[in-house]
Amino acid sequence: RALTTRRFAELSKTVLEENLSEAEAQERMGAEFRTPGHIPVCRESSGGLVTGQGHTELAVGLARLANLVPVVIGAEMLQPDGDGALSVANARIWASERNIPFLEGAEVIAAFHEQSQKPDASA
């Protein structure tokens, strides 16, 4: 899955840098990827964080804020026994123990709005 994700990001970067049309991008992507595949693909809503604040828009928005290719992979954290999602409190502990930042969606949205207010945000 890591190789698939890396190649998808590389190809997405190329598509964006070459400013390909939607048809050209679909052709380029379709030459290497098929659906269904072993990694579910989610697309952010048109307008990104301006029009939607779901997990996909938040993840892609975070990549954009970091000036990374807006291609991300999501994974659900599970309880140690594998029976259900990890609670937010336990996810915070897990992140803290590993010195990994833990962000709430509201923090990503606030950073997005702050950056969009900067004069050079459209550049």
Question: For the regions a protein language model found, what residue spans apply to each?
Answer:
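Catalytic domains of riboflavin
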Residues: 1-123
